[in-house]
Amino acid sequence: CTTGPCCRQCKLKPAGTTCWRTSVSSHYCTGRSCECPSYPGNG
C-alpha cells in the first residue's frame, strides 16, 4: 500500500490498529488492506 488510514511507510499497519474513532465507536485495521473498514472516506 502507498496511502490510506491503515498504511504507514508503504506497509500495512497490524490488524487491530485503530484507524479512526468517533465519540461512540472505534474502527480497526484488518492487516490486509490499506483502507479502514467503514471509514467515511471510502465512499
Curated annotation (Swiss-Prot):
Under the GO molecular function aspect, what terms does this record hold?
toxin activity
For this UniProt record, the keywords arranged alphabetically read as follows: Angiogenesis, Cell adhesion impairing toxin, Developmental protein, Differentiation, Disulfide bond, Secreted, Toxin
- What broad class describes the main subcellular location of this protein? secreted
Record GO biological process? angiogenesis; cell differentiation
Q: Which organism is it from?
A: Cerastes vipera
UniProt short sequence motif Cell attachment site, positions renumbered to this chain: 21-23
Outline the extent of the Disintegrin domain: 1-43
What compartments host this protein?
Answer: Secreted
**Entries under Gene3D superfamilies matching the protein:** Disintegrin domain
Keyword Zinc in record? no
Q: Name one GO cellular component term.
A: extracellular region
What does the tissue specificity note say?
Expressed by the venom gland.
Q: What is this protein called?
A: Disintegrin CV
Summary of subunit composition and partner proteins:
Monomer.
What does it do? Answer: Specifically interacts with the alpha-1/beta-1 integrin (ITGA1/ITGB1). Exhibits highly inhibitory effects on cell adhesion and cell migration to collagens I and IV. Also shows in vivo anti-angiogenic activity.
